[in-house]
Structure formats: structure tokens, C-alpha cells
Amino acid sequence: MARGFIDCHCHISASEFTTDTDDVLLRAKKAGVKALVAVTEGASEFEKVIQLSKTYPGFVFPCFGIHPLQGSGQDLHSVRVQDLDPFLYLFQTYKDDIVAIGEIGLDFTPWYSSITQERDEQMKVFIKQLEISKELDLPVNVHSRSSAKVTIATMKELGIRQALLHNFAGKPSVAMEGVQAGFCFSFPPAVSKNEQRAKLIRQIPLEHVCLETDSPALGLDKHVRNEPSNVTISCEYIAKVKGISSDVVMEVTTQNALRLFSKLKI
């Protein structure tokens, strides 16, 4: 197996990368990144992420998913069923191309989903996409802000076996429920400034940890665009917290990623 990193959760189809995708991916390769798992937040990105996977074959691996929050800026709102239903056919159309269903999940942050109706709608969209993942035999790439316990419980209820909980911020006891279910957890560079997250990372076995950047967001400086090349920062931080070498973290997390995303061929 080639030595190197896998960025298990990034948004390379985001508008922030439109003008210099080549340069961004070249920097990633120079940093030792061997593959990007490219998630989407909405159906408007589906065709773009497929095109990127064809432009950069064997490096950009596409996922389809509808995020629990839709829109942007002042228009950011909790997802609705109509954000998913008209695009369900695309999951079937591109089932051979996509390597996972994501980014999907729940976001119960009070200012985005303050009422039961919004949370119920999110749950419907989440469950529909979990069912798609089972039908297509694909792993899920999952968001769980302010909803860690219910997110893990829902996946367990539906019999999900292959899941990545990205930028996980739940309690260690909740994380261990995910570990027992066989799920993996990934952490972006921004967590290196968070002592609570260090406690969490210490408790999760390395065999259940993956690397991610969540780029263009969640870099060390929130005012600077994050990039896949910064997956090295996540690796070094996890190594420091666990008291092991960066090489061991790189090797084990890459093995974990290849096991989780079985369609990745690097």
C-alpha cells in the first residue's frame, strides 16, 4: 500500500476552490495526500463532484449527500424533504461512481433547528439517506452537531455498519457507543485548539480514527481557507495527544479509511 494520508471529509466542490483547484490538489499531493473523499452538502454539487472525480481520477473520490442545513449566510435553514426527494434518482444514476453517502446527518443547534417540526424533517431526510446507503451498500459520512447521541442511536437502529462521524464533538461515552458499533471518527485541524476534543481523541481507539480537513472550513485560522494538504496537521495533533508517532497515525488511519471506504483504490 502506498504511504500517505487520506482526507476522509473535504468539500473540494465548494466555490472557494473554483479558481485554483489544480494548485490546491497539487499542494495536497506534495504533502503526501493519496486520496480525497469529497462530500457534498446539496444536490447542486452532485454533477460538479462527479466531474472533479473524472478530472482527477484515483485521487478525488465523490460522495452524494444532502446536509442537514441548507442555504448559506442569512438563508441558512434546516433541511426539508423537498431538498432531497427530487434528486433521489441521481443516487441511482451515479451509484457506481460514488464511494459513500455524505455529508448527511443531524444538526440540532438551537438557532437552526429550534422546533420539533424542523428536527423531525431532518430525521426524515437522514433516514432516507441511510436507507439509500444500505440499498447501495455504501458507507455514510456523517454530521452530528448537537445531536451526537441521537445520530449514533439512529444509525444503530437502522443497522448501519460502515460510518464516519466527522468532526465529532459528542461525549466520550457516546463516542464509545459508536466504537462498539464499528463506526469511525475523524477530526479536522481546528480541533487542535480544543482541550475537550483532546480528551475525546485519547479515548477513541486509533483503529476507529480517520483524518479529515473539512476544507475549506475548520482550519487552524478560521479567517484562512483550509485545504486538504492540512490533513498533516490533524495527523500530527492526534499523534501528540495519543503519545505516538505521526507515522503510526498516518499508517493506521489510512488503513482504517481504506477499510471503511472500500471503493477507494489508491
Curated annotation (Swiss-Prot):
Superkingdom field: Eukaryota
Gene Ontology molecular function terms on file: metal ion binding; nuclease activity
Stated regulation of activity: The 3'-exonuclease activity is sensitive to the metal ion present in the active site, whereas the AP endodeoxyribonuclease activity is observed in a variety of divalent metal cofactors. 3'-exoxonuclease activity is suppressed in the presence of Ca(2+), Zn(2+) and Ni(2+).
Signal peptide: none
Gene3D superfamilies recorded: Metal-dependent hydrolases
Subcellular location: Nucleus
Record: residues binding Zn(2+) 1: H9, H11, E103, D214
SUPFAM superfamilies: Metallo-dependent hydrolases
Cofactor comment: Binds 2 Zn(2+) per subunit. Exhibits AP endonuclease and 3'-exonuclease activities in the presence of Mg(2+) and Mn(2+). In contrast, in the presence of Ca(2+), shows AP endonuclease activity exclusively.
GO CC aspect terms: nucleus
Function: Exhibits 3'-exonuclease activities and apurinic/apyrimidinic (AP) endonuclease (in vitro). Show preferential AP endonuclease activity on double-stranded DNA substrates and 3'- exonuclease activity on single-stranded DNA.
Family: Belongs to the metallo-dependent hydrolases superfamily. TatD-type hydrolase family.
Identification of the protein by name: Putative deoxyribonuclease tatdn3
Organism for this UniProt entry: Danio rerio (Zebrafish)
